[in-house]
């Protein structure tokens, strides 16, 4: 079975006191652009922009202050911190895990009605909708085991 130990659970989010304002990293290929000729994804960042994060079963997604482009969808969203302060203490070392996957851009639709028509305008908010990694872990758990190679 594929390991899920780097995927953030509710317990991880609570233990490390992940909260709005925390910076996250996102890997993706905005408009198909690559970081270099070797084809690596582009690393960008944003801050958690919604509350609450848990319980993930209830919230399902969270918002990241991050402008989404075509090619970002499906990209991993990573938490990475060195010497993080939580539970009132500085914890020396690196904390890293996968928070989720980019789903879409958050937008609001404005409806303007007149006597003869209704016009809808979509307003981009430069916010990414992130699917919690707990749902990725659930998917992985449904996969069949990887067959063992035979000599």
Where are these regions (language model features)?
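Gly/Ser-enriched beta-turn/beta-hairpin loop segments
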Residues: 36-42, 51-60
